[in-house]
Amino acid sequence: MQINCISFCELLHLFTDDVNRNNEILKGACEKADFKKVERLYIGSNFCSRYFLKYVESALKGIAKLTEIESGALKVTLCVPVFSQLYIDSAKKLIKSILNEYSFIDELTVNDFGMIEFASQLNNIRLNVGRMMNKDARDVRYAEYFNLARTPEVFTLTNSVLKNYDINCYELDLTSRFLDVKNVNENVAIYYPYVFATVGNICEFAGVSLPIEKKFRSNYHCAYDCVRFANEYRNEFGNEYLKVGKTTYFKVDDFVVKADKPYRMVYEPFDGLKSKGEQK
């Protein structure tokens, strides 16, 4: 059985204090995903600490006023990226504050081992392993590899590093067109239709509006132009790519999930919601 979820990670900036607009954003995402009912939202960022720290609080204020949140029909998973030493203390403080303020958040998704240790010490919150921790190779250009049925290797972590932690769910990408989780005991959440291919350290969009001598500098302040631009690419084989912030995704519309118990499908509504620039 498929459990319908929608991720607004990397799309936090869309939410404002306009209740009607926020409800329309959710409605539009559900229509795009062809969901008659959605059971969970994913909020935050999996890939950019600066984006998370700047937008998550204002977004949650808007999301808290969604009709389905106020009625108790929707629960929320808070996703957090990897934080550098520069931001780690402020990030932990912010995460604790958010979890204390918003009771509709009942899960925390983390993307590195250090944050797993931090999150495991929090009360009344379920812990998820984020998609950044699944290191499986992924490249849609190599059809003979991508079209093989495979089980993600991240589950081997449960028998080693993660065996001492109470993990609620593993979040995955479609690293294979035929994703086999049939013999997996753990709960899984699968993001689609975009698969993250790679994440860079230096963000192209951080300095779109900056002079050339200040572009591509990881230690320079961010202009947050990722909220205004995204790049689309297509190769000669018809594969579609999308670059949002530091992250490059490829699109997979045709896929099969083999499972013998309920699993989450997490729709990413980049299409139609993300303002795209003209650069291709």
Give the residues covered by each predicted segment:
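Active-site pocket-lining/capping segments in soluble small-molecule metabolic enzymes
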Residues: M1-K65, L74-K280
